[in-house]
From Swiss-Prot:
This is Long chronological lifespan protein 2. Disruption phenotype: Leads to long chronological lifespan. Present with 1990 molecules/cell in log phase SD medium. Transmembrane segments: none annotated.
Length: 131
């Protein structure tokens, strides 16, 4: 066999066995034992939910009333209650000031805060009233 044929055979062998080895490595050898999790669609989750109150559309949390729904990302969002008992979730204001950060991280003080220069729930309330 000529040298070029050996090169082709060697490259082909490396490709076949190399890809199998890489696949086994990245799948940790469990490529045939993969488990497929069946995730329910959003519609199925809503329709099959046993909630007997109000089902929050963003979090699928069951609460007594719509105004009791939590924000989907409470660590980074403030829940601002509007005058008509509706609410809107906004991003917490970004600040390096520890005093303001403590206020906005507080679940009671944060939604009631109205600090000049920050787009917080006070700002949302003013914007809603002037709407």
């Amino acid at each position: 066999m000529s040298q070029s044929r050996w090169s082709i055979v060697l490259i082909f062998a490396l490709f076949i066995f190399g890809s199998t080895g890489v696949n086994a490595f990245f799948n940790f050898g469990h490529h045939q034992q993969q488990q497929q999790q069946q995730q329910q669609s959003y519609e199925d989750q809503v329709l099959n939910n046993p909630c007997d109150g109000y089902l929050c559309p963003d979090t699928l949390t069951c609460v007594a009333q719509q105004k009791d729904c939590p924000c989907p990302f409470p660590k980074s969002q403030l829940k601002c209650v509007l005058p008509d008992n509706k609410f809107v979730c906004i991003s917490k204001p970004a600040t390096h000031n520890e005093k303001f950060r403590a206020i906005y991280d507080d679940p009671v003080k944060g939604p009631k805060a109205k600090n000049k220069g920050f787009r917080d729930c006070g700002w949302v309330s003013d914007a809603y009233k002037n709407h």
